[in-house]
């Protein structure tokens, strides 16, 4: 029996005894950051490039929001969403131990653990990327505060106070297709939303 699979870099019918492994989700073909690009499911390559540019241009500098609709990660015992896990690689920092905050600085947070040892957790301080962007973390805890292991210590400009990836603003939009071809589509937004963007 033939199954549709990926063989020699092409999607084609494959005999079942030739299959070496199976992916749980089609999104597993792409990495964490590639899955953030809008229009990734498009069958036309140029649309994928448009989407990556659109995302870069659409990111607000301040007051970003986590998505209203999030996808849970299969098999995650804590019930975290894709955006929760992505936030961990977007500059947010968590406490490795329970203890008391001794010091919060611009580049690290120091914790006196319940084990009596000091733990220094580095955070990003205007860390520059190569394309006119940077990542900056800001502590969400204060000196003298008690923290538990796994509690968020610092958020970044790409996450919210809970450490969830927050890249944009939630909006109700209208999609206006061009002659039904879905190639030169337009997106209509409200005046109120336009004011929120500025």
Indicate where each model-derived feature is located.
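Metal-assisted phosphate- and nucleotidyl-transfer catalytic regions
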Residues: 141
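Long, charge-dense accessory insertions within large macromolecular proteins
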Residues: 1-138, 148-198
């Amino acid at each position: 029996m033939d199954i549709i699979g990926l063989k020699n870099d092409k999607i084609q019918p494959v005999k079942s005894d030739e299959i070496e492994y199976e992916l749980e989700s089609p999104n597993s073909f792409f990495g964490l950051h590639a899955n953030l690009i809008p229009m990734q499911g498009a069958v036309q390559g140029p649309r994928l490039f448009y989407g990556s540019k659109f995302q870069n241009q659409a990111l607000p500098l301040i007051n970003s929001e986590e998505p209203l609709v999030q996808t849970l990660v299969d098999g995650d015992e804590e019930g975290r969403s894709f955006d929760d896990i992505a936030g961990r690689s977007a500059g947010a920092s968590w406490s490795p131990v329970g203890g008391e905050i001794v010091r919060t600085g611009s580049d690290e947070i120091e914790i006196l653990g319940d084990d009596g040892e000091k733990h220094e957790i580095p955070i990003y301080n205007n860390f520059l990327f190569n394309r006119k962007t940077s990542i900056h973390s800001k502590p969400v805890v204060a000196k003298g505060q008690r923290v538990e292991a796994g509690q968020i210590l610092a958020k970044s400009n790409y996450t919210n106070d809970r450490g969830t990836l927050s890249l944009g603003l939630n909006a109700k939009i209208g999609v206006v297709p061009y002659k039904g071809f879905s190639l030169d589509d337009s997106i209509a937004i409200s005046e109120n939303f336009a004011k929120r963007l500025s």
